[in-house]
């Protein structure tokens, strides 16, 4: 590339005068403006032009030598056709003696300026082609150009029909186009040789330019013999232009990407590449025009004209456009007569359109440019297709053909020599867009279209590297980790525009060029043409072909409605890429043996100059490095891939992509609860990863992170399968299903590896313990990966999630072993000792809980740590239950082992509460732990009370321990908070109070001596009975418990009455006992209600009703309690009657006592009659009791009122 100084030197001096609507900016100014991003318009009202030299290989500009008058240009100068220091390496090119530009010149430029292709530039072409297009309305000569579309950029190249047909005669290629062309012009094709005059004019021009750079030593003629040789050499050079055409795709696949292909003309041969903006058209133009400078003329173009032939319009346009494209403000014209120099004339670029005999409108040229571009944009719609813009010599009709479509009808569609360069360019543009870090996702549709069109053009067997890479890039376009937000596609463009064009005609100036093609009738109704301009005159009409179309068809990214569809699309591209890689891998045994008689060609060509498919390896390597650099292994794979080869690198990336896609599919299946399918996909993901590991020894941290994610998901799936054992058959069926695509990808993986590295994690077991164990191993493996790499610190959130899962699975396994131990315990009936199997299960369960607690504590997850501590407490309670005496119930005592394990359980529950800190952190868990702690204290106290260890401890000590445990149980039993557990808490509290009251009642009965202690026990018993009754009164489903408490209270009153001596004290106690009896009415009402509901149920026993109904009463218990109640009520009433009667004899006129006595006698007589009726049903007996209690309550109330 030329440096900035060279590029800047191409511009004219600042402040160049503006005349007739055109002005030019210096190169420095235009570059500066471009950098600032502001639009600069050159010229006044007619046209705007701006040129920026992007590249220049020209040497520093030197002043031209003004030749003396009468200099004979027919004599060659001494330096003719020789290199010169003033010319630099491109000397002959600068001076116009090179061959004409190669057929692929636009591709060479496109490769060099890949950033501009597809978006920024409308046209890439040789300046000669641009000029030829803009002169169409003025010229009768033929036009034959190949047009290709890449994104919104059109590539224009000359399509030399003569050369093609010469090639066809020699090789048999392109016969289809030859036949088509002959049908088109309706006559045999004949090649016309260029005239002697043509070669004479070229030689004169060449000698003139050499004289102009040779300075004082210019006019040094050489011998006529030398001149003839040089001239002959020049003619031969010019006449052999055909060698620049590449061979079509006829080479065997083994050499299809050989470096020698770079000689096919894909290099950028131009001295200058210029970004030319003409009005609103942005063009990348290649130019070889010699530019002189220095002294008075900083930048001029030099032209030679025959003084006898005036400049015509075509020549004027030619000169004007050349100067405009190269930003040259002046033209120096040297006039000669028969090769003898006459004079020089300086012309400003702006003055050229107004020269005599060469008058043309710059505005019309602008209209022609805009119309031609619009015409091509509207009709060259298919990316990758080769279009042929053709105008026969002398014709006014311009036609556009789609050669790709015509070629596809032939036997070998790869006969089109443009196919490969177009495919490479499509690939390079896509690759360039992909490698841009900040590439907006909205361009993904464009990239995808470029790549798909590239793939359409390539033969799979001949270009596996590009095909594999393109497929990989297609797979990279789809974001697997998040749903793709689709953007609305733009309205699709009409690919084959059949607009009717205007048929107006106008006279055009005669051409001064002799056409080498025969004029044909050119019927305008050619069915093979994509589009037709019926008259070149239409091109001069402003906005005649104003494009209403977009440059490209809709490139919207495909809408994938769900994750599976997106992943399947990715996997289809991955599979195609893998197939390409696999097909290109040949083991040494398959390679042909070297023939000793055949020389091995040595290639000395510079690597950097490559332009064909062989030059893509460097670009692909860059792309792969961009996506994640690879560490090379030092071994060969099973398939024979060489580490570091393109196959090795590409297969690694494709395999990694497949593993990601399968992981996302597995995750999606997991969310749909399709666990069998999820396990199948994660198995494929891990098999892909295993193959990756086999190919790549040094693992990247990114890949290790993927593996940790795969194993985490695998652990999740195994856990869910363990928890959903009911659908095992369905899961199994889904797990074993395989699509054809999956099988083919797996086949490619098996070429490199056995894929068994993670088989332990992906087997679908029917054993619950095995599934839980595998899940745990997956999480443990993930934890190890994160621990022994930098990933733990780089991905703290992922690490926390893994530890949470480890804690959770260890809890699950702990619970599993704990439940197994409990099951064994329930089966153990005869044996008194704990079995070794039970103890082993306890150890396993405890170990899992302990590790899980450690996992949660390490990430400060207090809630889950508390839950696991709670489960450990439950395990301790199971251990305690296992140690209870299994012999005779009457001889059983609460054992020290039971006490030990219950106290351990209490310790774990208290740790859980400490872990939570306060209820605010997690109220539900806090309440649950409190309940379990209360239950443990209650169970331990109950067992100590029921099976008092009197052989080891004194009665008083046991009573004290029971009392303390019961009070602690009450402390952790929340009866006030409204929740689903509140009735249970109330029942528990009532039961505790009942048991404490019973215990103090029993102590009072059995205790002699210490009156203070007896009084304390009496008070405590009364207090707890009262609290128990109140709490049972709140419950709707505990009438029997309430009745029992009240009967015990009555018994307690009776016991107190035995120690009383005075009748008054006894009457008071009896009155209190009868009041307790009255308060049992609520319990009897509840029993009555349930009995009535039972009777109301249909005899057939509707299952649904039975299910919804509350648990039926224990009739046996109710009858037992009722009998006790009847006997105690009868006893109390009788005692009351006796005491009141004896009191009445001693004292008279006590109205209250009389009323009570009367009421009690009446109730007592009714009770005796009721109890005597042995045929009465339970409900009838209850009804009688409720009735009697009502009378008793009414009598008590009446007596109270009388007293008042």
UniProtKB/Swiss-Prot annotation:
Function as written in the Swiss-Prot or TrEMBL entry: Transcription factor involved in erythroid differentiation. Involved in transcriptional activation of the globin gene.
Repeat region (TPR), residues: 693-726, 920-953
Gene this chain is encoded by: EDRF1
Keyword Transcription: yes
GO biological process, one term: positive regulation of DNA-templated transcription
Spans through the membrane: none
A Pfam family annotated for this UniProt entry: EDRF1_N
Residue spans of biased composition, Acidic residues class: 496-513
Region annotated Disordered, chain positions: 1-30, 220-264, 483-527, 586-613
Keywords annotated in UniProt: Activator, Nucleus, Repeat, TPR repeat, Transcription, Transcription regulation
Any one cellular-component term (Gene Ontology): nucleus
InterPro entries the UniProt entry points to: EDRF1_N, EDRF1_TPR
Name this protein carries in UniProt: Erythroid differentiation-related factor 1
Origin species: Pongo abelii (Sumatran orangutan)
Places the protein is found: Nucleus
Compositionally biased spans, kind Low complexity: 9-30, 223-241, 253-263
Primary subcellular site in the record, as a coarse category: nucleus
């Amino acid at each position: 590339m030329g440096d900035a100084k060279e590029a800047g030197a191409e511009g004219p001096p600042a402040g160049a005068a503006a005349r007739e609507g055109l002005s030019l900016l210096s190169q420095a100014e235009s570059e500066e403006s471009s950098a600032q991003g502001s639009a600069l318009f050159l010229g006044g009202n007619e046209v705007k032009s701006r040129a920026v030299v992007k590249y220049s290989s020209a040497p520093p500009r030197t002043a031209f030598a003004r030749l003396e008058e009468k200099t004979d240009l027919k004599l060659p100068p001494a330096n003719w056709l020789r290199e010169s220091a003033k010319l630099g390496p491109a000397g002959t090119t600068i001076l116009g003696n090179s061959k004409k530009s190669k057929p692929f010149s636009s591709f060479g430029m496109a490769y060099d300026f890949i950033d501009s292709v597809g978006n920024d530039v409308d046209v890439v072409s040789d300046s000669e082609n641009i000029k030829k297009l803009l002169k169409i309305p003025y010229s009768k000569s033929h036009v034959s150009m190949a047009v290709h579309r890449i994104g919104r950029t059109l590539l224009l190249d000359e399509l030399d029909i003569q050369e093609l047909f010469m090639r066809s005669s020699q090789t048999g290629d392109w016969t289809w186009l030859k036949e088509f062309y002959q049908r088109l012009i309706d006559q045999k094709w004949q090649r016309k040789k260029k005239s002697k005059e043509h070669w004479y004019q070229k030689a004169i021009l060449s000698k003139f330019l050499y004289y102009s750079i040779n300075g004082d030593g210019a006019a040094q003629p050489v011998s006529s013999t030398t001149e003839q040789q040089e001239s002959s050499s020049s003619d031969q050079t010019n006449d052999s232009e055909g060698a620049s055409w590449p061979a079509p795709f006829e080479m065997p696949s083994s050499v299809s990407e050989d470096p020698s292909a770079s000689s096919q003309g894909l290099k950028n041969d131009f001295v200058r590449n210029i970004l030319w903006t003409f009005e609103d058209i942005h063009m990348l133009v290649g130019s070889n025009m010699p530019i002189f400078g220095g002294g008075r003329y900083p930048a001029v173009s030099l032209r030679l004209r025959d003084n006898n032939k005036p400049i015509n319009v075509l020549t004027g346009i030619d000169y004007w456009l050349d100067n405009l494209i190269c930003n040259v403000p002046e033209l120096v014209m040297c006039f000669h007569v028969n090769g003898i120099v006459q004079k020089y004339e300086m012309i400003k670029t702006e003055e050229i359109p107004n020269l005599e005999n060469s008058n043309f409108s710059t505005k019309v040229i602008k209209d022609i440019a805009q119309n031609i571009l619009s015409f091509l944009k509207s009709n060259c719609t298919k990316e990758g297709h080769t279009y042929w813009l053709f105008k026969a010599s002398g014709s006014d009709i311009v036609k556009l053909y789609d050669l790709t479509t015509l070629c596809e009808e032939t036997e070998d569609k790869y006969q089109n020599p443009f196919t490969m360069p177009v495919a490479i360019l499509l690939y390079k543009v896509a690759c360039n867009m992909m490698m841009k870090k900040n590439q907006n996702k909205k361009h993904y549709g464009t990239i995808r279209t470029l790549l798909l069109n590239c793939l359409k053009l390539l033969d799979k067997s001949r270009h596996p590297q590009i095909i594999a890479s393109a497929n990989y890039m297609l797979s990279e376009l789809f974001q697997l980790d998040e749903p793709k937000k689709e953007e609305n596609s733009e309205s699709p463009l009409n690919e084959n525009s059949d607009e009717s064009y205007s048929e107006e005609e106008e006279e055009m100036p005669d051409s001064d060029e002799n056409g080498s093609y025969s004029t044909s009738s050119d019927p305008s109704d050619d069915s093979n043409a994509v589009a037709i301009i019926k008259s070149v005159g239409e091109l001069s009409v402003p906005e005649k072909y104003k494009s209403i179309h977009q440059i490209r068809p809709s490139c919207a990214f495909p809408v994938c409605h769900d994750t599976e569809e997106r992943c399947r699309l990715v996997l289809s591209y991955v599979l195609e890429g893998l197939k390409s890689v696999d097909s290109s891998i040949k083991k040494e045994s398959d390679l042909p043996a070297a023939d000793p008689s055949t020389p091995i060609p040595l290639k000395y060509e510079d690597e950097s100059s490559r332009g064909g498919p062989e030059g893509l390896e460097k670009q692909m390597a860059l792309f792969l490095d961009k996506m994640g650099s690879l560490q090379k292994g030092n071994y060969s794979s099973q398939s024979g891939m060489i580490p570091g080869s393109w196959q090795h690198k590409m297969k690694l990336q494709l395999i990694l992509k497949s593993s990601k896609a399968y992981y996302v599919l597995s995750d999606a299946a997991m969310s749909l609860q399709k666990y069998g399918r999820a396990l199948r996909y994660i198995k494929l993901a891990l098999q892909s990863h295993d193959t990756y590991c086999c190919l790549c020894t040094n693992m990247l941290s990114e890949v290790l992170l993927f593996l940790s994610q795969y194993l985490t998901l695998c652990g999740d799936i195994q856990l869910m399968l363990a928890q959903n054992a009911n659908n095992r058959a369905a899961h199994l069926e889904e797990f074993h299903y395989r699509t054809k695509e999956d099988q083919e990808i797996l086949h490619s993986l098996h070429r490199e590896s056995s894929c068994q590295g993670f088989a332990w994690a992906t087997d679908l077991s029917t054993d619950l313990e095995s599934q839980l164990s595998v899940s745990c191993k997956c999480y443990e493996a993930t934890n190890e990966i994160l621990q022994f790499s930098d990933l733990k610190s780089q991905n703290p959130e992922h690490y926390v999630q893994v530890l949470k899962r480890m804690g959770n699975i260890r809890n699950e396994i702990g619970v599993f072993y704990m439940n197994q131990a409990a099951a064994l315990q329930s089966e153990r009936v005869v044996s008194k000792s704990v079995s070794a199997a039970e103890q082993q299960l306890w150890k396993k369960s405890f170990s899992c809980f302990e590790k899980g607690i450690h996992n949660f504590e390490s990430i400060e997850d207090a809630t889950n740590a508390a839950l696991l501590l709670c489960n450990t407490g439950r395990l301790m309670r199971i251990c305690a239950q296992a140690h209870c005496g299994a012999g005779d119930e009457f001889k059983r005592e609460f054992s020290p082992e039971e006490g030990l394990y219950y106290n351990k359980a209490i310790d774990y529950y208290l740790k859980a509460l400490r872990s939570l800190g306060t209820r605010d952190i997690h109220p539900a868990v806090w309440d649950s732990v409190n309940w379990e702690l209360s239950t443990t204290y209650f169970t331990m106290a109950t067992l100590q009370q029921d099976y008092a260890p009197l052989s080891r401890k004194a009665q008083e000590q046991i009573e004290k321990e029971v009392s303390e445990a019961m009070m602690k149980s009450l402390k952790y039993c929340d009866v006030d908070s409204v929740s689903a557990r509140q009735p249970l808490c109330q029942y528990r509290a009532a039961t505790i109070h009942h048991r404490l009251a019973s215990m103090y009642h029993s102590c009072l009965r059995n205790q002699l001596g210490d009156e203070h202690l007896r009084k304390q026990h009496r008070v405590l018993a009364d207090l707890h009975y009262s609290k128990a009754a109140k709490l049972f009164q709140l419950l709707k489903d505990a009438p029997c418990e309430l009745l029992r408490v009240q009967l015990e209270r009555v018994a307690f009153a009776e016991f107190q009455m035995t120690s009383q001596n005075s009748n008054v004290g006894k009457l008071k106690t009896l009155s209190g006992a009868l009041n307790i009896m009255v308060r049992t009415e609520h319990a009897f009402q509840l029993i009555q209600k349930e009995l009535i509901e039972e009777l109301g149920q249909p005899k057939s026993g509707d299952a649904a009703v039975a299910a919804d109904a509350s648990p039926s009463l224990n009739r046996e218990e109710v009858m037992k309690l009722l009998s006790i109640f009847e006997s105690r009520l009868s006893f109390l009433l009788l005692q009351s009657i006796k005491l009141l009667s004896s009191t009445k004899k001693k004292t008279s006129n006590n109205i209250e006592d009389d009323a009570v006595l009367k009421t009690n006698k009446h109730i007592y007589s009714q009770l005796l009659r009721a109890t005597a009726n042995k045929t009465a049903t339970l409900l009838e007996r209850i009804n009688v009791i409720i009735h009697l209690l009502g009378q008793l309550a009414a009598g008590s109330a009446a007596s109270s009122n009388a007293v008042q």
